[in-house]
Amino acid sequence: MRPRVQTAAAWPRVCIESVTPSVDNGRFPVKRTVGDRICVEADAFCDGHDRIAVAVLWRPADAKTWASAPMRALGNDRWRAEFPLERIGTYEFRVEGWRDVFATLHADLEKKRAASTVLPVDVQEAVAVVQAAHARSEGALATQLQDILTRIGAQSEPLQQLAIVLEPDTAQAMALADDKPFRSEYPVTFRVESERRAAHFSSWYELFPRSQSGDGQRHGTFDDVIGRLAHIRAMNFDVLYMPPIHPIGAKNRKGRNNAVTAQDGEPGSPYAIGAADGGHTEVHAELGGLEGFRRLIQAARAHGLEVALDFAIQCAPDHPWLQEHKDWFTWRADGSIPYAENPPKKYQDIVNVDFYASGAVPDLWNTLRDAVLFWVNEGVTLFRVDNPHTKPFPFWEWLIADVRGRRPDVVFLSEAFTRPKMMYRLAKCGFSQSYTYFTWRNHKHELREYIEELNDGVPRECFRPHFFVNTPDINPLFLQTSGRNGHLIRAALATTLSGLWGMYQGFELCEATPLAPGKEEYLDSEKYQLRAWPERAPGDIVDEITRFNQLRRMHPELQSHLGTRFYQAHNDQVLYFGKFLDAGYLSRSRSMVLVAINLDPQAGQDAEVEIPLWELGLPDHASVAVEDLWDGHRFTWHGKTQHIRLEATRPFALWRIRAGEVA
């Protein structure tokens, strides 16, 4: 179909392209933290040689009016501006541009004045532009422009009049009076999720409350957990995370070490949710019931800890929903219901809901949302979601938006060990954080490639990696064979590479006994039985974990995976990288954190490393002040190349380097 001339004439003359930050061209919000400044960039240009103006407009999504800030030209038609995130919740921003008539006129007249080629008609036309601006202005701006015109009229010489036209005050007033001819706007309104600090920086400690009595034969309670809080906080953790705390099904209950049949008295898996006592909004009686949970919430707050709960959308075969809401499930022709599988794993004690069963929409969806809100009302605002990749993306996008629309302080952690694109899609759908492949990245090139992937493109804008060193389901092979040194290596990697890290109880004790050689499961897994954990043990790494968490709090560079750059260490067993907040902070502070980690748990390693003096604006022969962050020792490095040695028993080093100082 041929366009009409009138239609074509209305098409934008000012072109706006390649707006960032963006996820799928605005289909999903980018993620940031309250207090951040959003750096918006766009390509913008117009035909011919006329000047253009470009602006970013932003607001909290629930606000009626837009704030605006001019974007500055970076060169090659790229423009940039920033705006602050002053509260949590959703923000919106747009980019607009227009032909800047006065800026074009101003630039032309400056050139003519410099070349002494100004004609009287040039001044007349300039004054006419100011007069037109005055005619469409009101209030104080109209008064200011009238004063400018009066001053111009008081001058008889064109060059004297021109001098007033070219004054900075005139340019400022004309910018305010601009009627934005040929204004165009990028056709997408972009969104930003401004989340609280815990969404991007926190340290998680996971435990099973039933294993906290100190006696492997007595079921623990929330009050027993309260007795552990001081120790957990003393290790400088921020979050206490517990697996499901709901009634556990009796039907098809699993036994010790995942035995298909439980023996009398065995507690079963807490992931087999639901029994005669209730389901997702009830508390397992032996833990102390809801009142016990409320005591734990209050005690945790008093210790400066936040409690995270597991949200697992699955049911034991005797969950009340199977009787009360049969139309939420898929049944076989013989009236049975299939148990859950995640090949090669089989979960005979669990059945799954069907999100699109005949009675599921909207009842099941609303019920699950209400279960989350129930625990939010009980003081829980951190949720670790079990296997979200096996549930529909539309469900998560709806549920998270609904919950955060009511309570924007709620944070969701995705426990999805699946394909990268699925993990990133869950982040796009609203998950604040995600488990990652870190657990299986052990070699230098693997770690570097993975961190660089997370620092680029879509993952950078919406995917916050949570580096768990172990989980109740994952006893990494590396830890099984590397002892205390290996546990130190993984702790060092997790705490320095990501702002989010976590560990499951026993890691600090270097417990890594496998169910069988080559298996990632733990022997005597407390998913199926009670355990008794001491606070300390010979050869533990409690002190080191405490120090790592302390350093993370002290040094903002360690509070995000963003701003990680890898540098040259001439040894494949030494991972060496730098951390900084952003390029602007780096140029202002001329300071950064450097980290080196020996990846070999069996032997010490030496390496020649390159100190990134260029990052601080220094030549290769410069000197920098160095502080060893682990022990506080201060010294000076002279020149770009330095020799380091990392022992197997202390396989890491952290330094802060500063330009302009010598120790």
UniProtKB/Swiss-Prot annotation:
Any matching Pfam family: GLGE_C
Catalytic residues in the record: 386 (nucleophile), 415 (proton donor)
SUPFAM superfamilies the UniProt entry points to: (Trans)glycosidases (SSF51445)
UniProt site positions, description: Transition state stabilizer: 473
Signal peptide interval: none
Classification via Gene3D superfamilies: Glycosidases, Golgi alpha-mannosidase II, Immunoglobulins, Phosphotransferase system, lactose/cellobiose-type IIA subunit
Xref: InterPro entries: GlgE (IPR026585), GLGE_C (IPR049171), GlgE_dom_N/S (IPR021828), Glyco_hydro_13_cat_dom (IPR006047), Glyco_hydro_b (IPR013780), Glycoside_hydrolase_SF (IPR017853), Ig-like_fold (IPR013783)
GO-annotated biological processes: alpha-glucan biosynthetic process; oligosaccharide catabolic process
Keywords associated with the record: Carbohydrate metabolism, Glycosyltransferase, Transferase
Positions that bind alpha-maltose 1-phosphate: 254, 314, 349, 387, 527-528
Gene symbol of the encoding locus: glgE
Source organism phylogeny: Bacteria, Pseudomonadati, Pseudomonadota, Gammaproteobacteria, Lysobacterales
Described purpose of this protein according to its UniProt entry: Maltosyltransferase that uses maltose 1-phosphate (M1P) as the sugar donor to elongate linear or branched alpha-(1->4)-glucans. Is involved in a branched alpha-glucan biosynthetic pathway from trehalose, together with TreS, Mak and GlgB.
Catalytic reaction equation(s): alpha-maltose 1-phosphate + [(1->4)-alpha-D-glucosyl](n) = [(1->4)-alpha-D-glucosyl](n+2) + phosphate
PANTHER family: ALPHA-1,4-GLUCAN:MALTOSE-1-PHOSPHATE MALTOSYLTRANSFERASE, GLYCOSYL HYDROLASE FAMILY 13 CATALYTIC DOMAIN-CONTAINING PROTEIN
SMART domains the record matches: Aamy
Quaternary structure, from the entry: Homodimer.
Keyword match Metal-binding: no
Domain of life of the native organism: Bacteria
CDD domains, per database record: AmyAc_GlgE_like
Name of the protein this chain belongs to: Alpha-1,4-glucan:maltose-1-phosphate maltosyltransferase
Family to which this protein belongs: Belongs to the glycosyl hydrolase 13 family. GlgE subfamily.
Gene Ontology terms, MF aspect: alpha-amylase activity; hexosyltransferase activity
EC number: 2.4.99.16
Disulphide bridges: none
Region listing for Disordered, in residue ranges: 252-276
